[in-house]
Design a protein with these regions (language model features):
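Bacterial Sec-dependent N-terminal signal peptides
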Residues: 20-50, 97, 176, 190, ...
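Sec-dependent bacterial lipoprotein signal peptides
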Residues: 1-24
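Acidic/histidine-rich, surface-exposed loop or edge segments in extracytoplasmic proteins
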Residues: 35-44, 84-92, 184-189, 274-280
């Protein structure tokens, strides 16, 4: 259990004594006593303005940046406010002064310290190791770390640069955390940062030789032009916010030299030999070739989405309590068509013998301008035999939002359950590129709720004369059953399904709930065999109950216990090669019909008879 030095919100009647005790226990900078109080009706703006002995410099920067009204307005602001002593240190270390800061630098300084959320004030009780769920006003994430002091107390650090000395000052429009250093986010790429880390010199050299550092350097896709001219649009009577920019992001996993050396690798040349044992000898003389072994080795360490260590695995309330330690995710790496598996605890590619590659949390979450660097505890490779016969030889369930990296990089996935003032998001048909395409007639909605019967709270709802194509995760060659997870609704409509361009069976009715005779759902507790025979009967009709591992707060049931939570068996498919596969759904009945898209599953056919209910 982590013990954190925290002082809760105080009222004036608590007295000066309580404030002084908190000051001593948190070992804070030289703050005025009233910095520890929360006065009724104060905003973030008035809180800092009313304490010139502690926050005069930040207050002045806010005013000179023209942002006086920002922290005074209604909203949900989480402000990490540096003390005046923190600014003294910053000015001295950067050989500058308040007067020398440009207007742009002042705005950046304000935005670097403020998170503006639609509904959340981030209190320390909500912190976990890694990034906070909402980026700051400069689209950079606040990285939280817990570091023990010399006295053995766990202290909270932000961006590994600044310590929180006064936490959780709750105010009318947000919360203030007082910090002891000015936050200075890196403006360098991940490759440039790695070049400055001597402990990773072998990996950094390999990254340079492959030129893959150039592939992870961009921050925005400047080729994307949004067709939207307003902040909000109306879709089916709902207020939706269209995605206007396409931000890019990356995650880089790197073995430190110590891990390399433990594997007998002391130079890039030796790393090339090591990589060749897994990835072959094609184009051996050209490390920039995507077929080269070193290039493939490095590519498998890269994701085209930025994620901190607490962002790989879903952590919301829609997982059954018994299944928390069994949670998993699958992501396609930048080694084309090759997946990496994450399990709870950030165990990468865990084998049946319990061997896995871990992440060294203390050396990870290195924040660059467009992503994160994480340190590995063992060598990470895509071993064809192990991945096909062990790691990926299982049911692979993946949420709809996990497919396009654009939904992660632009703060959509797992971020929609606490919106205020609008219902969700929409996007243009080309926003997600090849990952997700739909026609202009599609009325496309992305929204979420912890109280709906969804796999990870998120859902996609499409109406109109829709025609939607999804690039499913690539899997190893083999024979798989593919399933669609959805919620059956009376307005579901009828659609034709396709896989890899081929029409699949007859049209599917998404408006049948499970208890209708076409499906035949019977609650497990109404059977004598815990639903075993009913499962067989439903499979014969092309359906399955929802998974027991997913929990719905509203109704206090798992999806298996919910009559409207179904899996439709799309069919059985044999894939000869590694390649992307495409799932298409086309409305053929009425523009009022809905396609509800929650998740997809691949299941090796050899495992179906022994499959669990999770």
């Amino acid at each position: 259990m982590i013990t954190i030095c925290i002082m809760n919100k105080c009222s004036v009647c608590c007295g000066i004594t309580a404030a002084l005790l908190a000051l001593a226990s948190c070992n804070s900078d030289d703050l005025s006593d009233d910095s520890y109080y929360t006065f009724k009706g104060e905003t973030v703006a008035t809180y800092i303005e009313n304490r010139p002995d502690s926050f005069a410099v930040f207050t002045q920067i806010v005013k000179e940046a023209g942002e006086q009204s920002l922290l005074a307005t209604y909203g949900h602001y989480t402000a990490f406010i540096p003390t005046d002593m923190a600014f003294e240190t910053y000015f001295r270390e950067h050989n500058t002064s308040l007067e020398q800061l440009t207007l742009e630098e002042k705005k950046d300084m304000v935005y670097n310290h403020i998170i503006r959320s639609t509904a959340i004030d981030y209190l320390t009780k909500d912190f976990t190791e890694g990034a906070l769920g909402t980026s700051n006003m400069n689209n950079r994430y606040m990285i939280i770390s817990y570091i023990a002091s010399d006295e053995g107390r766990n202290q909270i650090w932000v961006n590994k640069q600044s310590r929180i000395v006064v936490p959780d000052v709750e105010l009318h429009n947000g919360v203030v955390h007082v910090i002891d250093h000015v936050l200075v986010p890196s403006d360098e790429t991940l490759g440039s940062i790695l070049d400055q880390m001597p402990a990773y010199s072998i990996f950094a050299d390999a990254l340079r030789q492959t030129h893959l550092n150039d592939s992870i350097a961009e921050t925005y896709d400047m080729s994307y032009v949004s067709p939207y001219t307003t902040e909000f649009v109306n879709i089916l009577g709902y207020t939706m916010k269209p995605l206007q920019q396409r931000r890019l992001g990356y995650t880089l996993f790197a073995e430190p030299n110590s891990v390399m050396q433990a594997a007998g690798i002391n130079s890039v040349d030796e790393l090339k030999q090591y990589a060749a044992t897994y990835y072959g000898s094609e184009d051996a003389a050209d490390p920039t070739s995507r077929r080269n072994a070193l290039n493939r080795f490095i590519s498998y360490h890269l994701l085209n989405r930025q994620m901190s260590t607490n962002a790989f695995i879903y952590s919301g309330p829609c997982t059954s309590s018994y299944y928390m330690d069994k949670r998993y995710e699958y992501y396609e790496t930048m080694l084309e068509n090759r997946l990496i598996e994450f399990k709870a605890g950030n165990r990468l590619n865990e084998q049946q013998n319990a061997r896995f590659v871990g992440i060294d949390e203390s050396a990870s979450n290195i924040d660059g301008m467009n992503g994160f660097i994480h340190s590995l505890t063992d060598m990470l490779v895509y071993d064809e035999t192990i991945m096909q016969q062990d790691v990926l030889n299982k049911r692979i369930r993946f949420d709809a939002y996990s497919i396009p990296p654009q939904l992660t990089n632009n703060n959509i996935r797992w971020k929609l359950t606490n919106l205020d003032g609008f219902g969700g998001y929409t996007m243009s048909p080309d926003y997600c590129g090849d990952y997700f395409r739909f026609n202009d007639a599609s009325k496309f909605i992305m929204w979420a709720s912890d109280y709906w019967t969804n796999y990870q709270a998120d859902e996609i709802s499409v109406r109109g004369w829709y025609d939607v194509t999804v690039r499913m995760l690539p899997v190893p060659p083999g024979t798989y059953e593919i399933r669609l997870g959805y919620s059956a609704r009376s307005w579901g409509g009828i659609a034709q399904l396709f896989v890899d361009g081929d029409i699949i069976g007859i049209p599917v009715s998404f408006n049948y709930t499970g208890d209708q005779p076409q499906i035949g759902w019977i609650s497990d507790d109404q059977t004598t065999d815990n639903g075993a025979e009913n499962d067989k009967m439903m499979r014969n009709r092309g359906y399955m109950k929802g998974p027991n591992s997913v929990y719905a707060i509203n109704g206090q049931k798992t999806l298996r216990q919910n009559v409207g939570s179904l899996r439709f068996i799309v069919g059985t498919f044999t894939f000869q090669d590694y390649a992307p596969h495409y799932f298409r759904v086309k409305n053929i009945e009425s523009e009022l019909g809905e396609f509800h898209f929650d998740y997809l599953e691949y299941v090796p056919t050899s495992l179906i008879d022994s499959e669990d209910k999770d």
